[in-house]
């Protein structure tokens, strides 16, 4: 039976390669990222298995986007949070550090907390 997988941050690198592995395994894959053209490129390659949702985890509508993707997939079995940034802040520039915190901490906590509760309610995941 095919899993329903969401990968947060799947437009390049590890996230994209994980998406391809799950697709090869026959799973349904929801991919997210900030670069819509890269999301659509993957969806065009595998239209029967890939759904997309373009958003930045630093935004205020993470849960709305996640719920939309879960609806498109018809459920959720696996979530992979692969979004992260790491810029050098030589002068301890708060604006730069704020972006890192919003992505690596706030976005992670919001999405993983929602997903944990979703899995607990459905009894698996």
How would you label these PLM feature ranges?
Residues 90-102:
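Short alpha-helical oligomerization interface
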Residues 11-12:
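Conserved glycine-rich cofactor-binding loop
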Residues 82-88:
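Conserved NAD(P)H cofactor-binding loop of Rossmann-fold oxidoreductase domains
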Residues 75-76, 119-125:
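Active-site loop of short-chain dehydrogenase/reductase
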């Amino acid at each position: 039976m095919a899993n329903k997988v969401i990968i947060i941050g799947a437009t390049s690198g590890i996230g994209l390669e994980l998406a391809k592995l799950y697709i090869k395994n026959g799973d349904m894959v929801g991919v997210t990222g900030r670069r819509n053209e890269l999301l659509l490129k993957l969806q065009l390659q595998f239209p029967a298995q890939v759904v997309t949702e373009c958003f930045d985890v630093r935004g205020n509508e993470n849960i709305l986007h996640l719920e939309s993707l879960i609806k498109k997939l018809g459920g959720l079995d696996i979530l992979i949070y692969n979004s992260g940034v790491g810029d050098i802040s030589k002068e301890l520039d708060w604006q730069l550090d704020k972006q890192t915190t919003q992505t690596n901490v706030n976005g992670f906590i919001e999405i993983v907390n929602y997903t944990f509760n979703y899995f607990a309610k459905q009894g698996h995941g």
